[in-house]
C-alpha cells in the first residue's frame, strides 16, 4: 500500500500559503542548506510516521470549515515533497475531490528532466492550486556553497512552471553575508520578473530557531555567528529584487 513518509504536521498554520492551512512536513531532502531549521527531515528513511492517503484525508477534512472561512487549505512542505510524488498525486486528487485548496512548498532540489519525474510532476500539477518555490540563490556557485547542490535544474523548473502557467509564489531566505548581495538580488529580481506566473514574492529573514536540532544531531552549525537581518536590510532586499516594481505595503 502506498504510504507517505512524514516528519510532522501542523494543524492550523498561517505562513505557508493563503488562509489557515493544514501543513504536512514530509521526510527526505537532497539539499543541505547551511541554515536549515529542520535537518532532522533530511533522511527519507527515518520518518516519524508513515501514513496512507485515506488516513491523511480523514485527519484533514475536519478542518475544512476553517479552510473555507479563511480561504485556506492544505500545504505539503518538507523536507522536499517532490521526493514523494506518487503519494502526493493521490493525496491531492482526493483533497481536490473534497473541495480543498492544495499547495506545494518546494525547493525543487530533486527536479530533473527524466521521463519519470516529468510524468509524475505533470500528474501532480493537475491537482495543485499553488506552488511556493524557494529559490535559495541565483548564482550557481554561491548556491552550491549554501545548499551543497547547483541551481541550474531549479531555475529550469521555475521556467517550466511559468510555461505551464502554474500559479507560484517565490520565496528567498535572506542570510547576511550569503544571500544578501545587492547584485545577486538584482539578478534574482530580473529572473523572477521574466516569469509570467509569479503572483507573489516573499523574503524570509534568516533565523536560528533550528540550531538546537543541529546540536542534537551532532552536526556542526556553520552559521552560528550570523545574526538575523534587520528591517532595513529586508527593505533594501525587496527594493533590489524589485518584484513587479513594488515592495510589500507593510514595509
Curated annotation (Swiss-Prot):
Record EC number: 1.97.1.4
PROSITE patterns, sorted: RADICAL_ACTIVATING (PS01087), RADICAL_SAM (PS51918)
InterPro entries in the cross-refs: Aldolase_TIM, BssD/PflA/YjjW, Organic_radical-activating, Organic_radical_activase, PFL1_activating, Pyruvate_for-lyase_activase, Radical_activat_CS, rSAM
Cofactor note: Binds 1 [4Fe-4S] cluster. The cluster is coordinated with 3 cysteines and an exchangeable S-adenosyl-L-methionine.
Matching CDD domains: Radical_SAM (cd01335)
The organism's place on the tree of life at top rank: Bacteria
Protein's cellular compartments: Cytoplasm
One annotated GO biological process: glucose metabolic process
Record keywords, A-Z: 4Fe-4S, Carbohydrate metabolism, Cytoplasm, Glucose metabolism, Iron, Iron-sulfur, Metal-binding, Oxidoreductase, S-adenosyl-L-methionine
Binding residues for S-adenosyl-L-methionine: 35-37, 79, 134-136, 207
Reaction(s) catalysed by this chain's protein: glycyl-[formate C-acetyltransferase] + reduced [flavodoxin] + S-adenosyl-L-methionine = glycin-2-yl radical-[formate C-acetyltransferase] + semiquinone [flavodoxin] + 5'-deoxyadenosine + L-methionine + H(+)
Class of this enzyme: oxidoreductase
Pfam families, per database record: Fer4_12, Radical_SAM
Residues that coordinate or bind [4Fe-4S] cluster: 29, 33, 36
Protein name per Swiss-Prot or TrEMBL: Pyruvate formate-lyase-activating enzyme
Amino acid at each position: 500500500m502506498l504510504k507517505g513518509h512524514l516528519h510532522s504536521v501542523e494543524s492550523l498554520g498561517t505562513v505557508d500559503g493563503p488562509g489557515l492551512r493544514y501543513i504536512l512536513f514530509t521526510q527526505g531532502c537532497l539539499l543541505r542548506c547551511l541554515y536549515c531549521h529542520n535537518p532532522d527531515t533530511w533522511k527519507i528513511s527515518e520518518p516519524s510516521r508513515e501514513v496512507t492517503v485515506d488516513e491523511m484525508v480523514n485527519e484533514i477534512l475536519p478542518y475544512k470549515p476553517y479552510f473555507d472561512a479563511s480561504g485556506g487549505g492544505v500545504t505539503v512542505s518538507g523536507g522536499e515533497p517532490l521526493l514523494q510524488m506518487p503519494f502526493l498525486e493521490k493525496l491531492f486528487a482526493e483533497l481536490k475531490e473534497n473541495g480543498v485548496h492544495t499547495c506545494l512548498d518546494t525547493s525543487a532540489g530533486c527536479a530533473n528532466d527524466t521521463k519519470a519525474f516529468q510524468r509524475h510532476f505533470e500528474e501532480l500539477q493537475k491537482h495543485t492550486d499553488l506552488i511556493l518555490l524557494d529559490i535559495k540563490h541565483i548564482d550557481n556557485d554561491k548556491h552550491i556553497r549554501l545548499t551543497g547542490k547547483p541551481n541550474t535544474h531549479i531555475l529550469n523548473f521555475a521556467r517550466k512552471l511559468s510555461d505551464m502557467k502554474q500559479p507560484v509564489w517565490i520565496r528567498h531566505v535572506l542570510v547576511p553575508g550569503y544571500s544578501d548581495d545587492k547584485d545577486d538580488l538584482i539578478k534574482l529580481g530580473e529572473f523572477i520578473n521574466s516569469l509570467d506566473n509569479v503572483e507573489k514574492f516573499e523574503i524570509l529573514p534568516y533565523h536560528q530557531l533550528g540550531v538546537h536540532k543541529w546540536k542534537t544531531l551532532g552536526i556542526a552549525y556553520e552559521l552560528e555567528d550570523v545574526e538575523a537581518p534587520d528591517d532595513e536590510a529586508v527593505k533594501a532586499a525587496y527594493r533590489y529584487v524589485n518584484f513587479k516594481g513594488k515592495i510589500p505595503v507593510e514595509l
